[in-house]
C-alpha cells in the first residue's frame, strides 16, 4: 500500500520524505488555507520536492471552470493529479480530463455507488472519506470494503485512495482491505510508529545498559 501525506505544509512533506513515507501528496483548499500562502506558490514548491502523484484540487463547481483550472494546474508538472468533487459536473470533467491524458482524483466520495460512477468515468483515483462518515455514525471502512470489492469484480483500474484518515486504525483497516493508497496527516504518520511497549522496552534496555561495566578511558 502506498502512503500519501495529506497536507499543504512543505515542512511536513520534507519530514515525511526523510522517513521514506511519502509516495505522494494530497492537498485541498482547507489545507492550503492553513498555510497562509497562495496555492500556486505551494503547488510549485511541492512539485519540486515530490516525484510521486500530487493532487491539486479545483475550486470551480461547474464543468467549464473545472476544466479550466484542471488544465492550468496540470501544466505545473507531470506528477500533478487534478482533484475534482464527486458531482455530476465533476464526473463530466473527469471524463474529459481523462480523455486528454490528465490523471484525476475524484474526492468527497461517501458511497460505493458514487465510487462506481467515478470508475466508469475513468478516474485515476477515488477518495472515499472514512472519517467524515464515522462522524455521522456510519461505517467509513465498510464503504471502503464495498468499493474494493466492486472494483475487483469488474477489473476497474481506478485506485482506492482512502482519505479523511483520523487515526492508525483507519490505516490498518485500509491495508487489510487491500486499498491502494491511504492519504495520511503527518500527525497520524507519527502515531503509526508509536507503541507503549516499544517505549517501555527501550527505556528498560537503556536502564540495563547503564548497569553494564564500562571500559576505563
Curated annotation (Swiss-Prot):
Enzymatic class: transferase
Assigned protein family: Belongs to the transaldolase family. Type 3B subfamily.
Pfam families: TAL_FSA
Catalytic activity annotation: D-sedoheptulose 7-phosphate + D-glyceraldehyde 3-phosphate = D-erythrose 4-phosphate + beta-D-fructose 6-phosphate
PANTHER family given in the database record: FRUCTOSE-6-PHOSPHATE ALDOLASE 1-RELATED, TRANSALDOLASE
EC nos: 2.2.1.2
Principal place of residence: cytoplasm
Listed GO CC annotations: cytoplasm
Protein name from the UniProt record: Probable transaldolase
A molecular function (GO) term: transaldolase activity
Pathway it works in: Carbohydrate degradation; pentose phosphate pathway; D-glyceraldehyde 3-phosphate and beta-D-fructose 6-phosphate from D-ribose 5-phosphate and D-xylulose 5-phosphate (non-oxidative stage): step 2/3
Keyword set, alphabetical order: Cytoplasm, Pentose shunt, Schiff base, Transferase
GO biological process: carbohydrate metabolic process; pentose-phosphate shunt
Function per UniProt: Transaldolase is important for the balance of metabolites in the pentose-phosphate pathway.
Highest taxon of source: Bacteria
Xref: InterPro entries: Aldolase_TIM, TAL/FSA, Transaldolase_3B, Transaldolase_3B/F6P_aldolase, Transaldolase_AS, TSA/FSA_arc/bac
Active site annotation, chain numbering: 83
Keyword Cytoplasm: yes
Location(s) in or outside the cell: Cytoplasm
Listed NCBIfam families: fsa_talC_mipB (TIGR00875)
Amino acid at each position: 500500500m502506498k502512503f500519501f501525506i495529506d497536507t499543504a505544509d512543505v515542512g511536513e512533506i520534507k519530514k515525511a520524505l526523510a522517513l521514506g513515507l511519502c509516495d505522494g501528496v494530497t492537498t485541498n483548499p482547507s489545507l492550503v488555507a492553513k498555510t497562509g500562502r497562495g496555492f500556486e506558490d505551494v503547488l510549485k514548491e511541492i512539485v519540486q520536492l515530490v516525484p510521486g502523484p500530487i493532487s491539486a484540487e479545483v475550486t470551480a463547481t461547474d464543468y467549464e471552470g473545472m476544466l479550466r483550472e484542471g488544465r492550468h494546474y496540470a501544466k505545473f508538472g507531470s506528477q500533478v493529479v487534478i482533484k475534482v468533487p464527486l458531482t455530476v459536473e465533476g464526473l463530466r470533467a473527469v471524463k474529459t480530463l481523462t480523455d486528454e491524458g490528465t490523471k484525476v482524483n475524484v474526492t468527497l466520495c461517501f458511497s460505493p455507488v458514487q465510487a462506481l460512477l467515478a470508475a466508469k468515468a475513468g478516474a485515476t483515483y477515488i477518495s472515499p472519506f472514512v472519517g467524515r462518515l464515522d462522524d455521522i455514525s456510519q461505517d467509513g471502512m465498510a464503504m471502503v470494503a464495498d468499493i474494493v470489492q466492486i472494483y475487483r469484480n469488474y477489473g476497474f483500474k481506478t485506485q482506492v485512495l482512502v482519505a479523511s484518515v483520523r487515526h492508525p486504525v483507519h490505516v490498518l483497516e485500509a491495508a487489510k482491505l487491500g486499498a491502494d493508497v491511504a492519504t495520511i496527516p503527518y500527525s497520524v504518520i507519527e502515531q503509526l510508529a508509536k507503541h507503549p511497549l516499544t517505549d517501555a522496552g527501550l527505556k528498560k534496555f537503556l536502564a540495563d545498559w547503564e548497569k553494564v561495566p564500562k571500559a576505563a578511558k
